[in-house]
Amino acid sequence: MNGNLPHIQIQSPKNSLDHLNNGRQATHNFEHGKPGDREEANGHADAHSSSGRSRYLSSDTNLLRDGSSSLDPLSKHIMKRTRSEKTLSFLNPSRASSNTHLSREGTNRSSNVTRTVSGRKSNHGSSLTDTGESDQLSLKSFGAIRQPSQHRSSLFSRMLGSTSHIFGIREDMDNESSEEERDGIPRVEGNAADPFSWIPDGKNVWDSPPKYIRVLSHNKKEKSLDHLFLAQELYCKPTLAATHDRYYEPRATDFPNLAHESSEPSSSRHTADAQSITNASVHLHNSSSPLNRTPSVISDTLAVAITSNSSSNSSNNAIWAMKFSRDGRYLAVGGQDRILRIWAVLDSEHARSVASETCSSDPNNPKLNLKAPVFSEAPIREYAGHTADILDLSWSRNNFLLSSSMDKTARLWHPVRKDCLCCFEHSDFVTSIAFHPKDDRFFLSGSLDCKLRLWSIKEKAVSFWNELPELITAVAFSPDGGLAIAGTFVGLCLFYDTRGLRFRTQMSIRSSRGKNAKGSKVTGIQTRTQMIDNIAGDTEMLVTTNDSRIRIYNLRDKSLELKFKGHANAQSQNRAYFDDDGNYVICGSEDHQVFIWDLPPQHMHKTKKKKHEHFKASVRPITAAVFAPTKTKQLLTLSGDPVYLAAISARRSSVISNASIETGPSLRNLKSLSHSYLPIEIMKGHIIVCGDLDGRIRVFRQDSVFAARKLIEKKNIERKNSETLSNSSFFPQALKAHMNSISSPKRHFSLRHKKNASQITNNENNGNDDIKKGDEPEEEHVGLRKNSTQEKNANLDPNEALKRADMMMLQEGASSMVYYSLTNLDNPGATVNEAAKTAATIEQNEHEIQTSVDPISNVKAILPNADDVSSKNSSTEDQLECLRCGNSLFNVFSRSFVFEGAKFSIVCSHCNRKLLKSGSDDGSETHEMSTLP
């Protein structure tokens, strides 16, 4: 069996412990291997296969420093190793048509330039072509991607014409035009949008509303991601010279391949044993290590490499990997500039105020304040430990971060530490990594040496490993961690038991027919467990490939459930991701767009009409796109985020006034918000983060309270029109007819009398029915309310009854396009003062209460009849409610006006508002509607 394995060229440091025994399970007894008897020439070995494996050459050190091409470096190197002429022509279609001289020269090279490495041929007698021509292939503009090939249409399609394609375009355009006509707001392309900003002009009003971007939909009547706007822009800028103290400083001795490349012979830098595997060259940076220190100067090797790279080509900032931490607090970004950056989510009022000051500190910036940021402007950590492109990232449950790179290493980080915690060396490019979902002590790595490794961080060594038949490009775990999955360059997915990495089964990710029937490179794998009514269902596996397709498989029986298309993913490392709720799948596209597909219900998985939405997100190809997790939304809510604050205000019981906008209010009500519950407006307020080929990170947010704001504005207009109606002087008909026309621009805070509804009912029934008309009764405090409300709240807890009364109140006073302002309820000083005044008033009224008189018997004309109480179909015109607060519980006091021999006044028990008062102390009273100051 070992004779059929390919001879793999391994490059490793001189002192690395790469040699293992022949067994598949790794041990700690390492021995230095001896060079084999096979021939070597210029440090390269033959690559041959007898089992249909891909042909590839060993890594070249010069390829690590090649930053001139804008193409995904991993795809470029794999193409060079596999000698895929089809892929090379795919990258530059004009190479054979537009450039005649190059085509003619390429034809001549086909017979002359082909040569072997150091004048030798492979064992199969085929020649290995020169890499000089492929090295010169460079895409100046990655945006000029290959257009879809024009296939010859069939007879049936010629008879039908191209109506289906035309109808599809019309459908998208009609959806967009109807959306603009419906809300009357023009939209711009996402790649031309500016971040939403606010310029204060002294009145605290919005200078201009945010520009919603144009979102196109397919097979959808209503868009799920309408009213998107650009909220923030972040940049991966090379700031090593200015902030070198943020970087981890590796020494030159840590990289013997780069430091001693010119002094040592090439044969001394290679390992001859083809059956050995890189395992234990692990640098643990503990407290005693000299590397665990804050650098005073920048490493010369690293500084020169980064400075020369930045000066020679300023566009080498492409983003290849982007991941949110599991707790939603951090966003890690890595890419072509070799620097790992971590941004923090604004999770407190202080962090948001600091971010606002940072945004407004630039006098040359006309936009002084970004009002909807998600992250801090500057990254909290910038690590420069890697010496080549960063390809993949993985977060653990405890916020440990793993990064894999083309420098043949995987490194361990943590945001609270300024340096690298551990370095795990491999024999080839580490293309993908994944933390174990249940145990942070283990992680899975896949590399281009066709070996799948399960590492133990505690032991700093490989626990298990296995060899695959193809180049590994993606790895993942099952949700329970019992299954390890690896995707290959030819579209093969292999499944292994995590313990021991024993092979279980495999499946081919390819189309049944057409040009993609041979399989394409797997760029990403993600698994999740379906939740149906909070019950765990089947496990799904999301697979992204380079044939511009995204597939969802059932992990139990390996059956294909869904297949999405529409985006362009031919040569990039774009990966598709689920959102937290499992309702959408998101992926970036090489045509500068972001695509979002709807996940249909389980019983509709076989439907052919796949609904999706897409929008242009940048002027460059999108290389990574993710949804912000739900925990990120919770953190933003607690920090006083303006967008989510508006959603919270739309569900609050307080009445929003037309006061000025408070940019930093005291959010005591948001502090008590449960993390397990969020309003539906916040759940629909999606956040999309995408990165492009220029290193620009764009954050798009959804205005989730757009519909609620429009409804409130409409009700405000109706309320203002109702205020012009004249008030009648007759009671109680005036009270019933004009109760709904009472409105106040400001709510008066009061402590509500927390009496149980059942206790109030007993007091009403046990009163004295005999009232002497000649006596002058003391002021009485009784409950007057609708019996239907009494029956509704009779068995409720007082706090629950008050909460329901709050939910009945109507919100009013929209103040801006996107945001609302809080009332004085969010001002602790004003709240305490109002509460103290109201408490004193209630205490004074309670001293005047006497139980000798029952005014209820004298105002029986106002109360509903017993027949009305028992009737379920009572008229709504007889209901008494205070439209200021929506309360139906009133207090009746004496000595206010004369009615059937007694003087009374009706006051709302919730907002302490006097509804009626007498015009004189004698018997001639005038009933008029009035409000308390």
From Swiss-Prot:
- Its source organism is Schizosaccharomyces pombe (strain 972 / ATCC 24843) (Fission yeast)
Phosphoserine modifications at? 722
User: Where is there biased composition of kind Acidic residues?
Assistant: 173-182
What biological processes does GO assign it? Answer: exocytosis
What is the protein name given in its UniProt record? Uncharacterized WD repeat-containing protein C3H5.08c
Against InterPro entries, the record matches this protein to: WD40/YVTN_repeat-like_dom_sf, WD40_repeat_dom_sf, WD40_rpt, WDR44/Dgr2
Q: Where is the composition biased (Low complexity)?
A: 49-59
SUPFAM superfamilies hit by this protein: WD40 repeat-like (SSF50978)
Q: What PROSITE patterns does its record include?
A: WD_REPEATS_2, WD_REPEATS_REGION
Repeat region (WD), residues? 314-353, 385-423, 425-465, 467-506, 517-563, 568-607, 617-657, 665-710
Q: Which UniProt keywords apply?
A: Endoplasmic reticulum, Nucleus, Phosphoprotein, Repeat, WD repeat
**Which region ranges are annotated with the description Disordered?**
1-135, 173-194, 252-275, 756-796
Basic and acidic residues bias (residue ranges): 29-47, 769-783
Its primary localisation, in coarse terms, equals: endoplasmic reticulum
GO CC field: endoplasmic reticulum membrane; mitotic spindle pole body; nucleus
Residue ranges annotated as compositionally biased, kind Polar residues, are 1-28, 87-101, 108-135, 264-275, 757-768
| Compartment(s) where it occurs, according to its Swiss-Prot or TrEMBL record | Endoplasmic reticulum; Nucleus
